């Protein structure tokens, strides 16, 4: 099998297992809340700690990946994920669970950053968008399957059983990273790109803001819509799960298609199409007449999210190549930083906006953020000297 397809399989599996294990915790929250007497504040801290650890670890992960290659950091990440998963299975107090969640976030950075860099190494610019989107489809499959599998195992066996299955999956993932991953470049220390160069590049700024904005929108909806659906339509937990599952499925299934589109018509064009759609779609959930209508609308939002996210990784890789470097991980660490920051900001906005402003006005504010990025994107394209 060609090396690039081995890299694609390993990265697909890595992203899938990382996301699957992240979402294992969702159906187990009632257990922690009831049996271990955790407060809603502690539950919120558990979720937020993952994003904060991911946020803190992303740039160091990029520097390590560009210095030591892709394979070693991916294996280090699995070691941390193994410890975190074992802690989840056996922890009986908040402190150990918090440590597990932080380790899981740091391990995620050592999976995503070198994983994206591995794909960029093996696939040329004209194939990179589709390849990266296929790996993201693995992550979205984890979003859909994680809560379902964990809920089934916890119901029919024990609340520890999902994490035992997780350890088995990590072992399989380890074998793949050990024997299938091949580093095709050795990036020397002198070739790493200073962070100020990345942050000062206007096109990279556009892609970073786009990644953060898409994650803000997603996290905002996850934090406020379940309560809205419960109160307005009396939706059951299962119905809410299917509604958000449809969002994840639409995003995941369309990723390879939109990824190929970015390779054909250009990353900025695809990004702007997504922003134009999101400007109008994001204001509509509070106007839907039924939970079914909300679910169908979320499918459209999932598709628009794909248009926004898919151009980001291959776009950053292309800009790094134009700088005369192959230090992709440094650029991808900035995207991962934006992603994790978006998780934190989206949940925060859901908590502070909806109460005083209401859902409709809050969604209108998010639409204005999309307008702002769209204007900035056109400005950057109209003034190439900014790059």
Predicted regions located by residue number:
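Intracellular juxtamembrane helix-capping segments at the cytosolic ends
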Residues: 111-123, 308-322
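Helix-breaking motifs and short loop linkers at transmembrane-helix boundaries and internal kinks
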Residues: 37, 69, 90-96, 234, ...
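Paired small-residue
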Residues: 84, 95-103, 292-300
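Cytoplasmic helix-loop-helix junction between adjacent transmembrane helices
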Residues: 100-138
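Juxtamembrane intracellular "pre-TM" segments in multi-pass secondary transporters
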Residues: 1-2, 182-208
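C-terminal membrane-cytosol helix-exit motif in multi-pass small-molecule transporters
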Residues: 168-186, 376-380
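Conserved MFS/SLC helix-loop-helix module at the cytosolic interface between two early adjacent transmembrane helices
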Residues: 56-92, 262-268
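Short amphipathic helix-loop junctions that connect adjacent transmembrane helices
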Residues: 28-40, 224-238
């Amino acid at each position: 099998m060609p090396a690039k397809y081995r890299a694609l399989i390993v990265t697909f599996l890595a992203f899938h297992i990382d996301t699957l294990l992240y979402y294992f915790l969702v159906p187990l929250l009632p257990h922690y809340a009831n049996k271990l007497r955790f407060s809603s504040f502690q539950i919120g801290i558990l979720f937020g700690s993952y994003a904060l650890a991911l946020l803190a670890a992303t740039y160091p992960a990029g520097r390590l990946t560009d210095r030591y290659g892709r394979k070693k950091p991916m294996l280090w990440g699995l070691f941390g994920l193994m410890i975190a998963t074992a802690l989840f299975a056996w922890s009986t107090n908040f402190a150990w669970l918090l440590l597990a969640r932080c380790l899981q976030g740091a391990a995620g950075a050592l999976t995503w950053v070198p994983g994206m860099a591995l794909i960029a190494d093996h696939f040329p610019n004209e194939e990179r968008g589709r390849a990266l989107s296929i790996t993201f489809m693995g992550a979205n499959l984890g979003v859909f399957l994680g809560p379902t599998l964990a809920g089934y195992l916890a119901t029919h066996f024990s609340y520890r059983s999902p994490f035992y299955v997780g350890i088995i999956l990590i072992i399989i993932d380890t074998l793949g990273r050990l024997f299938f991953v091949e580093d095709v470049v050795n990036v020397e220390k002198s070739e790493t790109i200073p962070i100020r160069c990345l942050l000062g590049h206007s096109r990279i700024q556009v892609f970073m803001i786009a990644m953060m904005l898409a994650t803000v929108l997603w996290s905002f909806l996850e934090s406020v819509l379940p309560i809205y659906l419960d109160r307005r339509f009396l939706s059951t937990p299962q119905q809410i799960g299917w509604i958000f599952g449809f969002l994840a499925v639409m995003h995941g299934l369309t990723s390879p298609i939109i990824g190929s589109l970015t390779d054909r018509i250009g990353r900025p064009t695809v990004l702007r199409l997504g922003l134009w759609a999101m400007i109008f779609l994001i204001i509509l959930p509070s106007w839907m007449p039924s939970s079914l209508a909300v679910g169908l609308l979320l499918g459209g939002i999932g598709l628009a999210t794909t248009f926004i996210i898919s151009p980001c990784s291959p776009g950053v890789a292309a800009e790094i190549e134009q700088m005369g470097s192959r230090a992709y991980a440094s650029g991808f660490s900035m995207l991962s930083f934006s992603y994790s920051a978006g998780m934190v900001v989206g949940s925060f906005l859901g908590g502070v906006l909806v109460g005083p402003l209401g859902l409709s006005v809050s969604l209108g504010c998010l639409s204005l953020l999309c307008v702002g990025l769209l204007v900035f994107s056109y400005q950057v394209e109209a003034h190439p000297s900014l790059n």
